[in-house]
Amino acid sequence: VYAENPPQNEPRSEGGWEPLRWAYERARKSIERLKPDVLLVHSPHWMTQQGHHFLGVENLRGTSVDPIFPNLFRYKFGLDVDIALAEACCAEAQNLGLTAKMMCNPDFRVDYGTITTLLMIRPQWDIPVVGISANNSPYYLTLDEGLEEMDRLGKATRAAIEKTGRRAVLLASNTLCHW
């Protein structure tokens, strides 16, 4: 993954990853023009078995270390969470019958999907965030049930954004090998 990285990860070639890096550069410019109040990150790497969780700690800071390549991928991060919007998203999800809760552990280890997405799209770490977990229940539901669950989560999130008057951009973390 080549974005703004630690020195050992700086790109040294015009190889196959360049189009991906250029796409992130274009996305950054697009987001800059939108001037969002908040970035929402729905990450498949923060898996929850019971319901949908929302980050509920005002400031989360640390170093993310990749468990497979700890000497290559180390990112310092510092994110501020939009607690009011996260709580509104959680409440709206509950109102639509979803199991949802706030994650309020100050020692919570932020998942690498959230951190990497934010690092690549907004390396300044200057826009508040709402982190949303990936509820694993769709793996145990039919396709239609899983899609309906995600549709309700989207509607709840949209309602919360509208009620709070935020300008928001939704970022969906993913990897090229998740199929």
Task: Name the predicted role of every residue range.
Residues 1-179:
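Soluble secreted/lumenal catalytic domains
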